[in-house]
Each structure stands twice: as structure tokens, then as C-alpha cells.
Amino acid sequence: AGEALREMEPDKRILLFSRSSYIGMHRYGGVWTGDNKSWWSHLKLSLAQMPALNMCGFLYSGSDMGGFGADCTEDLMARWLSLAILIPLYRNHACTGTRLQELYRFTHLDDFKKLIELRYALIPYIYSEFMKAALRDGMYMKPLSFEYGDDPRAFEIEDQILAGESIMLAPVVEQNRTGRNVYLPEEMKMIRFRAFNDYTEEI
């Protein structure tokens, strides 16, 4: 399909992604992680899958936000949306027969709106860092240990990843949690980052 699209539209960039894949397919498009479930364990798994897919060359990747199968709760959807803010493939997708999970069906619409606004505010960063990785045969999403190789603790952290050169993603991935502990390597500076117009005040 990728070769056919390039032949039909040689002067245009194409957007192509698939569930099935093989090594080398990243030259033609991206991949999503398949039919996941609306489970907290799958939310955490999707965080681990992003660097793994990047290592195989798949920079354009992502999971079905909220999970594809089973019934998504509002809390799980909010956490998935938060995790996915920096992930290139950003889509809510669910199976027929599961609870409808379009964002407008939940009660905290204002919270979802703010998350989506933040996503849109970050698109220039995502695009810039994504293209840097693509042009340099690098990774857009990577484990802490790839950047902080001299830090033994960085090798133990599996629920925080780097998105581009300047942002670390450390989402809440457990049910009934209002926060989490975050490991900051010594060279890293933490800044407040809560809304699309609020990312300069140091804490």
C-alpha cells in the first residue's frame, strides 16, 4: 500500500498505519498496538510499548486510548488521555458491544477539554521532535536509561519515558491514584506543566 500511494501521489507525504507489521515497514507508515483492553494493566503496557516500537523504527505509533475491548471508566479514560498527550497516534477507538467511550459521554468534560487543548498546544513540539528523530534515525520516545546511561537508577524505571529531547512522561497508571512518585535524574529540571498556557513556573 505504501509503495502504491507513493507511486500515485509522488509529491505528497502519506499517512499510513496498520495493526499488522514487520521489520522494515516503518519506511511506509506506522503501527498501533492492536486490540487492547480497557484495563489499567494495558494502560501501563502501552507506555512500555512506545519505546520498544521506536527501537524497531516505528516512530508513528500508539494504542487505542481507553482500550478497545471491555468497558472503559471515566478515570481510566482520563489517565489514558494524559498518557497519550505526547504519543504521535492519538485516537480513541473501541469495540462494538462495549460501553460507549466518546469523551462527551463522561461527566468531567472540562478536564477532557483541557487535556485536548494541551495536546494541541504541544503539536509543534511533537512534530519537531518526531521529525528530528526520523531524519536522524533516532528515537522519539525512549527509556530514561538511553539518555542517562551513567545513572543506575534510570535502568530500573519502567513507567517513565522521554518524549523528544525536553519532556519526560510520567503518567499515573494505577487505579484509584491521585498522584505518583517521579524519579528525576540529577541533570533534569522539573517545571510546572498543568495547562496549555502554564509551563514556565518552576516548582
Go through each PLM region and give its residues.
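Catalytic-domain carbohydrate-binding cleft regions of carbohydrate-active enzymes
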Residues: 1-203
